[in-house]
C-alpha cells in the first residue's frame, strides 16, 4: 500500500483508492495503525500528521507528503521505493514505453548498435545510475527519479541462447505488462545502496555471501567487505574437459565487447579487493575505446591509466601509444593490469592472422609475468587465445559473454600464481572451455562455509536457502551468529513442503519457529526496508519466492512498536471479512466457537482470543513483516515499551486460545503449514511463559449481585470469577491483588440476557462485560506467580440451579455487584469486600 498525505481532499476519483481523515481523538500511532489496515492500495491521508507518516515509513509502508496535483498524479499511478530519511522517491514506472522508448542506466549500451535491433520507431535513452538523470523531469517538493530501466531485459538476453533481440525484447515487454511488478528486485539496488554504507560505518569487518552481477557496482565503494561466491574456474579444472574445435557462434546481434571488457575488469577489481582490501590503480593495455569506464566512475572513483594508439575518452590518464615489454617498469604496486592487446586482422589471411594472434598471446603472457614478478599487491587479467599453452594450475579462467564465441578467453593471475606449478593445456581443451563455459558472475571468490564468524557482520541476501547447504547448518549459523542480516526462503506452501523448486535448483523453506534466537528481528522484505530508512509502496506477494529477513544483533530489537511491528496485522482479515465472508464478524465468531465459547453476544467487543496472534498465524503469508516471536517474547519478560497507540496487554492464556483457533482454522483449510506454525508458536508461548493451570482448584473468586432477574434454587447465585490453586500461606498475596484491582472489579458493567444448560444438571445464566477485567486480573496473578484459571477457556456464568431447566431469554439486564469474595472450595470464605 502507499499513503499519500494531503492537506485537503481532492475532487478527482482514483481506482483502488480510499480516503482517511486524521482522527484528532486518537494519537499518531493509533491513526497509523488504522491506516495500515485499510484494504485499498492507495490511501489519501487528509489533514495528516507528520509523525504518523514517520511511523508508517519505519514500518516499511511508503507514506509521502504531497504538495501539488502533479506530485499526486506521479505517485498514484505507479509503485515506488521511498528513502524517507533523505526524502527521495525512486519510481518504478514503465510508462515511458508510451514514448516508444527503452531505458538503460549503463552508458556502454548507448555506444553499441543496439538501436538497429529495437522495435520499429523506438529509441534508447540513458538515464544514469538508478535513473538519476531523470530528476530534472520532476519539479517536486521531494527528490524524485525514475529508477525503472530495461537493463534486466538486455542482460537476460546477453546470457540467453536467443539471438533475435527484437523478438526477445517484445516478449519481455509484454510479460512486464501482464505480470505483477517484482518490487523486491526493483528496489533491491536502492536497498543495497542504503544497507552497506550503514553497516560498514558501524562494523569494521563485514562479510557478504553470494553476490551476483546485479551487485557489481554496489560494492565498488567497499573494498574491505569480504565477498564469498561460488569460486573460480581454475586451469586445473580443465582436466575434465574433452578437446573440441573452434565453434564461431554468434551470441548477440549487437556488439557486447564493451560489456565483456567491463566484466573482466570488475572481476579483477573484486579479486584484488579480497586479497588486499583496498582500491587499486587500474592499468589497461589496448584500452580503446572503453566507454564502460564512464559507468564504473558513476559509482566509484577509480584512477585509470591506459595505453592505446586510439582514444580512450573516459580514462584518467591516457597514453596514445603502444605499450611494450620494456614499459612494465612504469606500472606501480597496488594495482591491477588489464591486458587486452589484439591487432586488427584487416585483410590478413587467416593462417597468417592465427600466427599473429598466438604471438600476441605469448607476448601478453610475458608482460603479465614480468608485471607480477616484482613489487607487491598486483593482479593481472590477460587476454589469451586457444592454443597449446602452459599456464599456472591456479590461474583463474574467465569467459564472460562476448558478441561471438571464437578463440579468445582471459585469465586472472596474481603474484602467487606465477610461482606455482604450470600445466600444459592443449588448444582443443581451451576450445572446450570457450565453447561450454560462460562466466556468469564477476564475483569469483571461494564459497562460504556455514560457520559463525564472531568478529564479523555477515550479510547473506538470497544466498543460503539452496539445498546443497545442509538445512540444519543454515539454522545453526543463524542461531549462533551474533551480528548478521541473513535471508532464508519462507515456507508459504500449503502442504508444509520442506523444499521447493526454484529455477533449476531446490530451496529449503523456513518458518520463524525454526530459529532460536534472541535480540533478533525476523521480518519481511518491506519490514526490513523500514529498519534501514526505506519504505515501499508494494508488499511482497503471499505466495512465490519470498524470504524471511533475519537481523541479528540489531539495536532496534526493543523498539517493538516502531520496527517490524503490528502495522497491517488485520489488513488481510479486513479484505476477507468485508468482501467474501458470511459476516464481517466471522473471525470473532470462529475464534469463540473454536474455543467452545458459545455466548456470541458482543463477540466483536468482548472476546477471549488474541486477534493479533490469530491473524499473525492464519494470514502469516500476508503479514509476516510483524515479528510475532519477538512480540511474544518481549511481553513474556515484561520489556514492552511503546511510544503510543491503543495498547492492550494480553494475558498469556489469550495467546494460547489464539493458537488453538488458528489450528482449527488451518485444519478446515487443509493448510498444513499454518497447522505446524500454530503448534510451534503455542509451544514457544509455553516455553517463554511459565503458565500453570488450576485444573484441580482449591479456591475460587465469587461475585455476588444485589439481585438476579431469574428464578434460582441455589443458596447464593454468584459469578465464579476464576479459580485458583494455592497454598494457605498464599491467601494474603491473593487478597493483596484483589485489593489492588478493587476499583476495576467494581466498575465492571456486568449484564445478562439468557439462561442455558452449561452441562447436564447445571442451569446457568450468561454474564457479559467481564472478560477484559478477568484477563487483567489474570495478568496480575501471573506476575505474582499465583496459579489462576484453568486450561479450558473461561466462560463467565452465574449458576442458578443444579437441575435441568428450559432456556429463558430476557432483555439485556445490568447487574449491580454487591460484593466480591475469596472462598475455599467446599470451605469457608476467607476474604470479602464491598464497594
From Swiss-Prot:
Pfam families: Rotavirus_VP3 (PF06929). The keyword Oxidoreductase does not apply. Its EC number is 3.1.4.-, 2.7.7.50, 2.1.1.56. Keywords: GTP-binding, Host-virus interaction, Hydrolase, Inhibition of host innate immune response by virus, Methyltransferase, mRNA capping, mRNA processing, Multifunctional enzyme, Nucleotide-binding, Nucleotidyltransferase, RNA-binding, S-adenosyl-L-methionine, Transferase, Viral immunoevasion, Virion. CDD domains: capping_2-OMTase_Rotavirus. The active site is at residues 718, 720, 797, 799. One of its GO terms (cellular component) is viral nucleocapsid. Residues 556-692 are annotated as: GTase/RTPase activity. It is found in: Virion. PROSITE patterns: SAM_MT56_VP3. Residues 693-835 are annotated as: 2'-5'-phosphodiesterase activity. It catalyses: a 5'-end diphospho-ribonucleoside in mRNA + GTP + H(+) = a 5'-end (5'-triphosphoguanosine)-ribonucleoside in mRNA + diphosphate; a 5'-end (5'-triphosphoguanosine)-ribonucleoside in mRNA + S-adenosyl-L-methionine = a 5'-end (N(7)-methyl 5'-triphosphoguanosine)-ribonucleoside in mRNA + S-adenosyl-L-homocysteine; 5'-triphosphoadenylyl-(2'->5')-adenylyl-(2'->5')-adenosine + 2 H2O = 2 AMP + ATP + 2 H(+). Residues 171-245, 429-555 are annotated as: N7-methyltransferase activity. Interacts with VP1. Interacts with VP2. Belongs to the rotavirus VP3 family. Multifunctional enzyme involved in mRNA capping. Catalyzes the formation of the 5' cap structure on the viral plus-strand transcripts. Specifically binds to GTP and displays guanylyltransferase and methyltransferase activities. Has affinity for ssRNA but not for dsRNA. Capping activity is non-specific and caps RNAs that initiate with either a G or an A residue. Together with VP1 polymerase, forms a VP1-VP3 complex positioned near the channels situated at each of the five-fold vertices of the core. Counteracts the host innate immune response thanks to its phosphodiesterase that degrades the 5'-triphosphorylated, 2'-5' linked adenylate oligomers produced by the host cell IFN-inducible 2',5'-oligoadenylate synthetase (OAS). The host RNaseL is therefore not activated. This is Protein VP3. The lineage of its organism: Viruses, Riboviria, Orthornavirae, Duplornaviricota, Resentoviricetes.
Amino acid at each position: 500500500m502507499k499513503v499519500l498525505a494531503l492537506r485537503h481532499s481532492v475532487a478527482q476519483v482514483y481506482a483502488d483508492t480510499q480516503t482517511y481523515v486524521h482522527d484528532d481523538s486518537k494519537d499518531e500511532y493509533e491513526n497509523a495503525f488504522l491506516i495500515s489496515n485499510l484494504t485499498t492500495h492507495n490511501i489519501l491521508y487528509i489533514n495528516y500528521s507528520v509523525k504518523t507518516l514517520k511511523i508508517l515509513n519505519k514500518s516499511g509502508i511508503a507514506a509521502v507528503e504531497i504538495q501539488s496535483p502533479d506530485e499526486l498524479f506521479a505517485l498514484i499511478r505507479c509503485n515506488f521505493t521511498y528513502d524517507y530519511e533523505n526524502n527521495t522517491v525512486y519510481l518504478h514506472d514503465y510508462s515511458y514505453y508510451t514514448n516508444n522508448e527503452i531505458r538503460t542506466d549503463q552508458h556502454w549500451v548507448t555506444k553499441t548498435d543496439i538501436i538497429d535491433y529495437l522495435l520499429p520507431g523506438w529509441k534508447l535513452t540513458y538515464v544514469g545510475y538508478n535513473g538519476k538523470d531523470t530528476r530534472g523531469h520532476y519539479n517536486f517538493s521531494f527528490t524524485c527519479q525514475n529508477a525503472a530501466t530495461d537493463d534486466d531485459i538486455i542482460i537476460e538476453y546477453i546470457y540467453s541462447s536467443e539471438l533475435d533481440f527484437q523478438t526477445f525484447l517484445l516478449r519481455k515487454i509484454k510479460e512486464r505488462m501482464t505480470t505483477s511488478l517484482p518490487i523486491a528486485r526493483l528496489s533491491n539496488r536502492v536497498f543495497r545502496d542504503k544497507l552497506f554504507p550503514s553497516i560498514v560505518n558501524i562494523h569494521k569487518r563485514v562479510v557478504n555471501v553470494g553476490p551476483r552481477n546485479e551487485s557489481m557496482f554496489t560494492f565498488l565503494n567497499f573494498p574491505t567487505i569480504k565477498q564469498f561466491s561460488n569460486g573460480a574456474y581454475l586451469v586445473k579444472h580443465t582436466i575434465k574437459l574433452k578437446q573440441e574445435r573452434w565453434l564461431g557462434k554468434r551470441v548477440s546481434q549487437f556488439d557486447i565487447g564493451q560489456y565483456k571488457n567491463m566484466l573482466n575488469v570488475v572481476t579483477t577489481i573484486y579479486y584484488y579487493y579480497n586479497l588486499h582490501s583496498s582500491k587499486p590503480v587500474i592499468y589497461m593495455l589496448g584500452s580503446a575505446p572503453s566507454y564502460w569506464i564512464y559507468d564504473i566512475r558513476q559509482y566509484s572513483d577509480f584512477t585509470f591509466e591506459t595505453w592505446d594508439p586510439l582514444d580512450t575518452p573516459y580514462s584518467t590518464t591516457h597514453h596514445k601509444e603502444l605499450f611494450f615489454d620494456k614499459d612494465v617498469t612504469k606500472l606501480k604496486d597496488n594495482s591491477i593490469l588489464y591486458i587486452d592487446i589484439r591487432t586488427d586482422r584487416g585483410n590478413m589471411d587467416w593462417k597468417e592472422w592465427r600466427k599473429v594472434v598466438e604471438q600476441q598471446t605469448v607476448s601478453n603472457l610475458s608482460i603479465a609475468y614480468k608485471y607480477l614478478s616484482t613489487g607487491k599487491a598486483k593482479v593481472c587479467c590477460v587476454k589469451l587465445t586457444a592454443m597449446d599453452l602452459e599456464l599456472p594450475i591456479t590461474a583463474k579462467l574467465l569467459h564472460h559473454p562476448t558478441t561471438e564465441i571464437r578463440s579468445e578467453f582471459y585469465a586472472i593471475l596474481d603474484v602467487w600464481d606465477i610461482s606455482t606449478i604450470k600445466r600444459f593445456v592443449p588448444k582443443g581443451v581451451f576450445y572446450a572451455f570457450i565453447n561450454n563455459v560462460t562466466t556468469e558472475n564477476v564475483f569469483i571468490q571461494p564459497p562460504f562455509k556455514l560457520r559463525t564468524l564472531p568478529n564479523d557482520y555477515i550479510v547473506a541476501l538470497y544466498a543460503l536457502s539452496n539445498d546443497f547447504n545442509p538445512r540444519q547448518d543454515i539454522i545453526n549459523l543463524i542461531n549462533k551468529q551474533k551480528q548478521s542480516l541473513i535471508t532464508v526462503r519462507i515456507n508459504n506452501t500449503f502442504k508444509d513442503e520442506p523444499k521447493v523448486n526454484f529455477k533449476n535448483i531446490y530451496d529449503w523453506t523456513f518458518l520463524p519457529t525454526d530459529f532460536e534466537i534472541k535480540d533478533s528481528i525476523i521480518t519481511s522484505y518491506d519490514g526490513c526496508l523500514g529498519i534501514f530508512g526505506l519504505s515501499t509502496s508494494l508488499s511482497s506477494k503471499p505466495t512465490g519466492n519470498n524470504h524471511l529477513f533475519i537481523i541479528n544483533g540489531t539495536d532496534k530489537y526493543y523498539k517493538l512498536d516502531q520496527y517490524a511491528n503490528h502495522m497491517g496485522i488485520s489488513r488481510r482479515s479486513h479484505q476477507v471479512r468485508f468482501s467474501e465472508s458470511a459476516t464481517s464478524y466471522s473471525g470473532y465468531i470462529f475464534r469463540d466457537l473454536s474455543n467452545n465459547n458459545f455466548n456470541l453476544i458482543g463477540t466483536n467487543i468482548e472476546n477471549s482470543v488474541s486477534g493479533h496472534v490469530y491473524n499473525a498465524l492464519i494470514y502469516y503469508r500476508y503479514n509476516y513483516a510483524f515479528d510475532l516471536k519477538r512480540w511474544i517474547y518481549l511481553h513474556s519478560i515484561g520489556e514492552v515499551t511503546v511510544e503510543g497507540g491503543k495498547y492492550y496487554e494480553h494475558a498469556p492464556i489469550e495467546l494460547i486460545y489464539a493458537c488453538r483457533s488458528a489450528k482449527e482454522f488451518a485444519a478446515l483449510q487443509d493448510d498444513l503449514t499454518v497447522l505446524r506454525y500454530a503448534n510451534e508458536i503455542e509451544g514457544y508461548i509455553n516455553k517463554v511463559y511459565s503458565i500453570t493451570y488450576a485444573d484441580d482448584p482449591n479456591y475460587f473468586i465469587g461475585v455476588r449481585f444485589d439481585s438476579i432477574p431469574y428464578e434460582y434454587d441455589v443458596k447464593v447465585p454468584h459469578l465464579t470469577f476464576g479459580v485458583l490453586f494455592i497454598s494457605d500461606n498464599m491467601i494474603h498475596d491473593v487478597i493483596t491483588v484483589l485489593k489492588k484491582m478493587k476499583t476495576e472489579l467494581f466498575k465492571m458493567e456486568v449484564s445478562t440476557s439468557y439462561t442455558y444448560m452449561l452441562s447436564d444438571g447445571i442451569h446457568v445464566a450468561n454474564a457479559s462485560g467481564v472478560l477484559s477485567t478477568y484477563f487483567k486480573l489474570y495478568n496480575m496473578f501471573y506476575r505474582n506467580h499465583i496459579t489462576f484459571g484453568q486450561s479450558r477457556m473461561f466462560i463467565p456464568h452465574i449458576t442458578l440451579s443444579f437441575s435441568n431447566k428450559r432456556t429463558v431469554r430476557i432483555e439485556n439486564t445490568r447487574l449491580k455487584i454487591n460484593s466480591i469474595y475469596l472462598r475455599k472450595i467446599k470451605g469457608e470464605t476467607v476474604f470479602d469486600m464491598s464497594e
